[in-house]
Swiss-Prot record:
This is Chaperonin GroEL. Its main location: cytoplasm. The lineage of its organism: Bacteria, Pseudomonadati, Pseudomonadota, Alphaproteobacteria, Acetobacterales. InterPro entries: Chaperonin_Cpn60_CS, Cpn60/GroEL, Cpn60/GroEL/TCP-1, GroEL-like_apical_dom_sf, GROEL-like_equatorial_sf, TCP-1-like_intermed_sf. GO terms for molecular function: ATP binding; ATP-dependent protein folding chaperone; isomerase activity; unfolded protein binding. ATP binds at residues 30-33, 51, 87-91, 415, 496. GO terms for cellular component: cytoplasm. The keyword Protein biosynthesis does not apply. It is an enzyme of class 5 (isomerase). Its EC number is 5.6.1.7. SUPFAM superfamilies: GroEL apical domain-like, GroEL equatorial domain-like, GroEL-intermediate domain like. Disulfide bonds: none annotated. Gene3D superfamilies: GroEL, GroEL-like equatorial domain, TCP-1-like chaperonin intermediate domain.
Length: 543
């Protein structure tokens, strides 16, 4: 086991604070509408330009092990806030730095770190309640667009696009962000259920120009296993031909004789047919086939439940208004399923989302719910260069998360004003002892840090701006850093989601409190590598 370095007390906290400052100073230049960009070097390809706090934080790794520990703890604040709220990472970093700085001073002055932490926790609880009580619920598309615009750094086009997407797919719909091939950013909404599997053979195509298969009012056979022979299916195929409607087969795979027979029948015009592989893998595939069956009013043909292909009738097949099949995607439009069954299935998936502990599973379940209940929208982000597209994509991601958070928990005035005003809730607060009172005071000072930093990044004096904002009693009165004016922030559309502000403060206080109470640090001692031996002389060389 390698030897360890151990640092204690003030020495440990000083090293840690140095790391915190390096990371926080790099992140906080991005805060606010006039925040600057940070350029990140990449081991291959062009450098990446970003204004996203968490992307900057994730890139920072320091040479000194003890400084790095401090930096990584603050990085954790940014990551946690990003995971929960999806935005507010820079605000969380600024708050954490302010709490740790003030806390370190108090500990150096001889105060009890545990009491300081208790005071910080109590004050944060009161501030969170104050934020919740001053929250305004948002409902109109205009307000949703305002939240998106603020988070996208003042780009109205992005805000409006997100509001439009949310309107079309509903609160349970899925909105994804992708890179576009062209210059323009566009919104693409998929109506109906789409999954990422296309036709098994290009011979099923009905539109050779676009290479797609479009089938109107088809029957849908949902089969769990592989189809290699059509013999068991012949009675069913006869019934489908007599009905005069197309047939879509969704199965694990269709190959061999079965595929050849279907293709020949399609080419001769005897049967309008297409075959698609089932989406997903393993248990998730079973669940997705069940979703398709409920959406289309059909049954999954599976030997597990005792249904064999020979005994399948037309009543067991699903139906839809239209199915559109591309090389890599299939879309089912207006499935003929019973609406009560679909609602029941949605409630079942919602219950699974509540219970699951895995982020990956939760994401997949939400996708399934969206396909059944809402819809899927894709925002394709365009730009002139790859660097620009990546930078815009970061901002669209942030804006999307902020908008979702705003719909979920409501909004408060933006620009760091809500946190600064929440400090008034701490005025009459009583603590058990003086050290805890100082903990409350640390939070009160830290609450002004985001407002001061936004003003500083806009070229103003942070202390003067904070003083002027707090002099005015109006809750929505604040500083518009973009225009350099004092105004009613909510009316001007400068708003923050309550969830983002709350999460940023709670995460910052959690890590800040832990760092203040640190008394010792242990890190591996770097090994001194011996210099390489000089190469020996070659034979016949005159040394």
């Amino acid at each position: 086991m390698a030897a360890k370095d151990v640092k204690f007390g003030a020495d440990a906290r000083e090293r840690m604070l140095r790391g915190v400052d390096i990371l926080a100073n790099a992140v906080k230049v991005t805060l606010g509408p006039k925040g600057r960009n940070v350029v990140l070097d990449k081991s291959f390809g062009a450098p990446r330009i970003t204004k996203d706090g968490v992307s900057v934080a994730k890139e920072i790794e320091l040479a000194d092990k003890f400084e790095n520990m401090g930096a990584q703890m603050v990085r954790e604040v940014a990551s946690k806030t990003n995971d929960i709220a999806g935005d507010g990472t820079t605000t969380a970093t600024v708050l954490a730095q302010a709490i740790i700085r003030e806390g370190a001073k108090a500990v150096a002055a001889g105060m009890n770190p545990m009491d300081l932490k208790r005071g910080i926790d109590k004050a944060v609880g009161v501030v969170v309640d104050q934020l919740k009580s001053n929250t305004k619920k948002i409902t109109s598309p205009e307000e949703i667009a305002q939240v998106g615009t603020i988070s996208a750094n003042g780009e109205t086009e992005i805000g409006e696009m997100i509001a439009s997407a949310m309107q079309k797919v509903g609160s349970e719909g899925v909105i994804t962000v992708e890179e576009a091939k062209g210059l323009h950013t566009e919104l693409d909404v998929v109506e109906g259920m789409q999954f990422d599997r296309g036709y098994i053979s290009p011979y099923f195509v009905t539109n050779p120009e676009k290479m797609t298969a479009d089938l109107d009012s088809p029957y849908i056979l949902i089969h769990e296993k592989k189809l290699s022979s059509l013999q068991p299916m012949l009675p069913l195929l006869e019934s489908v031909v007599q009905s005069g409607r197309p047939l879509v087969i969704i199965a694990e795979d269709v190959d061999g004789e079965a595929l050849a027979t279907l293709v020949v029948n399609k080419l001769r015009g005897g049967l309008k047919i297409a075959a698609v592989k089932a989406p997903g893998f393993g248990d998730r595939r079973k669940a997705m086939l069940e979703d398709i069956a409920i959406l289309t009013g059909g049954q999954v043909i599976s030997e597990d439940i005792g249904i064999k292909l020979e005994s399948v009738t037309l009543e067991m097949l699903g139906r839809a208004k239209k199915i559109h099949i591309e090389k890599e995607n299939t879309t089912i439009v207006e499935g003929a399923g019973n609406s009560d069954d679909i609602k029941g299935r949605c409630n079942q998936i919602r219950a699974q989302i509540e219970e699951t502990t895995s982020d990956y599973d939760r994401e997949k379940l939400q996708e399934r719910l969206a396909k059944l209940a809402g819809g899927v929208a894709v925002i394709r982000v365009g730009g002139s260069t790859e660097v620009e597209v990546k930078e815009r994509k970061d901002r669209v991601d942030d804006a999307l998360h902020a908008t979702r958070a705003a719909v979920e928990e409501g909004i408060v005035p933006g620009g760091g004003t809500a946190l600064a005003r929440a400090s008034s809730a701490l005025k009459g607060l009583t603590f058990d002892n003086d050290d805890q009172r100082v903990g409350g005071e640390i939070v009160r000072k830290a609450l002004q840090a985001p407002l001061r930093q936004i003003a500083f990044n806009a070229g103003e004096d942070g202390a003067v701006i904070a003083g002027k904002v707090l002099e005015n009693e109006g809750y929505v009165f604040g500083f518009d850093a973009q225009k350099g004016e004092y105004k009613d922030l909510v009316a001007a559309g400068i708003i923050d989601p309550t969830k983002v502000v709350r999460t940023a403060l709670q995460d910052a206080a959690s890590v800040g409190g832990l760092l203040i109470t640190t008394e010792a640090m242990v890190a591996e001692r770097p090994e001194k590598k011996a210099p390489a031996a000089a190469p020996g002389g070659m034979g016949d060389m005159d040394f």
